[in-house]
Amino acid sequence: MFSIQQPLLVFSDLDGTLLDSHSYDWQPAAPWLSRLHEANIPVILCSSKTSAEMLYLQKMLGLQGLPLIAENGAVIQLAEQWQDIDGFPRIISGISHGEICQVLNKLREKEHFKFTTFDDVDDATIAEWTGLSRSQAALTQLHEASVTLIWRDSDEHMAQFIARLNELGLQFMQGARFWHVLDASAGKDQAANWIIATYQQLSGRRPTTLGLGDGPNDAPLLEVMDYAVIVKGLNREGVHLHDEDPARVWRTQREGPEGWREGLDHFFSAR
């Protein structure tokens, strides 16, 4: 399929993909992370998490200095060596976190939708919801261009809520455990395409791309990849792509980082 010697970018979701959904362990993927690092193949993290959370995790994973995609594509953290690019160190897409909060508060007040955002609670509550430490939970509240929430209303009201958001230029995106509100123009796919184009411009050659994800919000990212790994996940809706050619897409039997490793094993040994 491809070799570790060719120009390659690996885009990876975090929770439920590279990280275990419950323990946040990534050790089953560690050998591949080391191998990719030694081959100078960037592993670009893509998540609904804030850039503050992701920079912390990026360092723990040994991926510091690489670009990353935060808040479902609404934020792009640039690579350390891209200091000449406009917007360094981060590019923010569309409506800001504060503006989205204002919209949500008005909708909740006037139309009585029931939901709880991360801005409504303290870090201790988020730590309880997520299993994170309080210091890590505090990083989850540092949104720049999205809002994370728990939906506490009916499916019928959700449809009305989504329609209202769309009218206001916003989208409602489902993650592994929470829902996210962000600018309608933002997305993991747009952010990934921007990063791919930047690498192509700098190297003079378009790199081959491999994406890994486990949730519905990863589908746009995986659609624009040359090859995709759909890691077996907890979400009942799963991931469905328009092009699921077995030569391009691999669905893992294992979950989390074990599935991540399985996907890398498949594509690097398939040819």
Swiss-Prot record:
The main location class comes to cytoplasm
EC assignment: 3.1.3.70
Q: Where in the cell is it found?
A: Cytoplasm
Cite the GO molecular-function annotations of the record: magnesium ion binding; mannosyl-3-phosphoglycerate phosphatase activity
Catalysis performed (reactions): 2-O-(alpha-D-mannosyl)-3-phosphoglycerate + H2O = (2R)-2-O-(alpha-D-mannosyl)-glycerate + phosphate
Q: Is Membrane found in the keyword set?
A: no
Cofactor(s) recorded in Swiss-Prot or TrEMBL = Mg(2+)
A Gene Ontology biological process in which this protein takes part is: mannosylglycerate biosynthetic process
Q: Where is the active site?
A: 13
Keyword field: Cytoplasm, Hydrolase, Magnesium, Metal-binding
Cysteine disulfide links: none
The signal peptide, as residue positions, is none
Top enzyme class:
hydrolase
One GO cellular component term, please give it. Answer: cytosol
Q: Report the domain of life of the source organism.
A: Bacteria
Listed binding positions for Mg(2+) are 13, 15, 214
What family is it from? Belongs to the HAD-like hydrolase superfamily. MPGP family.
Q: What is this protein called?
A: Mannosyl-3-phosphoglycerate phosphatase
Instruction: Supply the source organism's classification.
Output: Bacteria, Pseudomonadati, Pseudomonadota, Gammaproteobacteria, Enterobacterales
